[in-house]
């Protein structure tokens, strides 16, 4: 099976369009890509890189370097490298929602997304907290954020919250939903029949038997015991400061961190260029780059395409595995 994937560049003034141009310089055999984007923005990126780009009708086949099938999502105003324009916020969101709807309808099998500038979208009059939340709302589901590279996968019990709000946000129902979502995704999309999930404690030293906080004793441990009784292979709660040692990571399929900066610094240190962002719980695989819009680099030809390449490869793999598991 050769999955059909949506490719969304993200912020038109950032590095997303040029990364997409670089991506299609090698024809792909693992998937067929359909870009949801403004054609002039893609052409400008190709010209800046001095690379070939042939924008094709949706029904065509990409055969030579630079071929890219396109579904037009026109910008409101011409984009300029490094100068994000809130007037184009609607086009950015429209491309994301169009890609998501194409997957929900069964037309496409997955979505690969470039970086989006949250502040610019909000300045354009659109309430936007992130692509993860946008696609979850469109699909009417609750999702889990996971980041991954070639060394480790890290899922998050909470995402973009102030640290003082994290403990209150972690409840037994929310943590149970997160664990069930991660477990199901590892089985269905990663093809792991019995995934091992390491669960980090919320507090230093995983609470030190209640001396450094009671969340582990009162909430995490009882929940893990109940889910283990159902057959889930859950390890923890583990102290976060030692859970990422290589010898321990070798025994886990995924680490569940309780908050953003508990798990992601280790992942990004171990391989930022190859890191990708996955949304678990959607009816289709969505994989994004794990970097920002880099407005200061746009149009200069120096942006590293590794994350987008990794995201596309992984999304194709997940789409194929999902079909096999159906």
From Swiss-Prot:
Record-linked Pfam families: PdxA (PF04166)
Binding site for a divalent metal cation: 160, 205, 260
Enzyme Commission number(s) of this protein: 1.1.1.262
Class of this enzyme: oxidoreductase
InterPro entries: PdxA (IPR037510), PdxA_fam (IPR005255)
Any Gene Ontology biological process: pyridoxal phosphate biosynthetic process
MF annotations from Gene Ontology: 4-hydroxythreonine-4-phosphate dehydrogenase activity; cobalt ion binding; magnesium ion binding; NAD binding; zinc ion binding
GO cellular component: cytoplasm
Reaction equation(s) it catalyzes: 4-(phosphooxy)-L-threonine + NAD(+) = 3-amino-2-oxopropyl phosphate + CO2 + NADH
Manner of cofactor binding, per the entry note: Binds 1 divalent metal cation per subunit. Can use ions such as Zn(2+), Mg(2+) or Co(2+).
Annotated substrate binding sites: 132, 268, 277, 286
Subcellular location: Cytoplasm
Cofactor(s) of this protein: Zn(2+); Mg(2+); Co(2+)
Keyword terms: Cobalt, Cytoplasm, Magnesium, Metal-binding, NAD, NADP, Oxidoreductase, Pyridoxine biosynthesis, Zinc
Pathway(s) of this molecule: Cofactor biosynthesis; pyridoxine 5'-phosphate biosynthesis; pyridoxine 5'-phosphate from D-erythrose 4-phosphate: step 4/5
Complex and partners: Homodimer.
PANTHER family from the UniProt entry: 4-HYDROXYTHREONINE-4-PHOSPHATE DEHYDROGENASE
Annotated function: Catalyzes the NAD(P)-dependent oxidation of 4-(phosphooxy)-L-threonine (HTP) into 2-amino-3-oxo-4-(phosphooxy)butyric acid which spontaneously decarboxylates to form 3-amino-2-oxopropyl phosphate (AHAP).
Note: The active site is located at the dimer interface.
Homology family: Belongs to the PdxA family.
Record-linked NCBIfam families: pdxA
Protein name, entry field: 4-hydroxythreonine-4-phosphate dehydrogenase
Protein's organism: Stenotrophomonas maltophilia (strain K279a)
């Amino acid at each position: 099976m050769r999955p059909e994937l949506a490719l969304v560049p993200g912020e038109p003034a950032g590095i997303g369009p040029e990364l997409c141009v670089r991506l299609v310089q090698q024809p792909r055999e693992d998937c067929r890509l359909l870009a949801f984007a403004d054609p002039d923005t893609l052409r400008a990126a190709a010209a800046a890189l001095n690379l070939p780009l042939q924008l094709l009708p949706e029904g065509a086949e990409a055969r030579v370097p630079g071929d890219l099938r396109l579904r037009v999502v026109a910008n409101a105003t011409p984009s300029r490298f490094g100068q994000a324009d809130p007037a184009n916020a609607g086009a950015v969101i429209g491309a994301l929602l169009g890609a998501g709807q194409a997957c929900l309808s069964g037309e496409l099998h997955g979505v690969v997304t470039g970086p989006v500038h949250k502040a610019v979208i909000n300045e354009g009059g659109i309430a936007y907290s992130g692509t993860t939340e946008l696609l979850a709302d469109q699909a009417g589901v609750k999702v889990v954020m996971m980041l991954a590279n070639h060394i480790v996968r890290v899922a998050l019990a909470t995402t973009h919250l102030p640290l003082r709000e994290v403990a209150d946000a972690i409840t037994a129902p929310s943590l149970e939903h997160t664990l069930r979502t991660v477990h199901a995704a590892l089985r269905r999309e990663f093809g792991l029949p019995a995934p091992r999930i390491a669960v980090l404690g919320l507090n230093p030293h995983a609470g030190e038997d209640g001396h450094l906080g009671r969340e582990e004793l009162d909430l995490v441990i009882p929940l893990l015991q109940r889910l283990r009784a159902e057959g889930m292979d859950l390890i923890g709660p583990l102290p976060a400061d030692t859970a990422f040692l290589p010898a321990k990571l070798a025994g886990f399929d995924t680490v569940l961190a309780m908050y953003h900066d508990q798990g992601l610094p280790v992942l990004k240190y171990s391989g930022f260029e190859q890191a990708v962002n996955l949304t678990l719980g959607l009816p289709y695989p969505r994989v994004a780059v794990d970097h920002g819009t880099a407005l200061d680099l746009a149009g200069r030809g120096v942006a590293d395409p590794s994350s987008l390449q990794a995201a596309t490869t992984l999304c194709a793999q997940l789409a194929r595995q999902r079909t096999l598991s159906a």
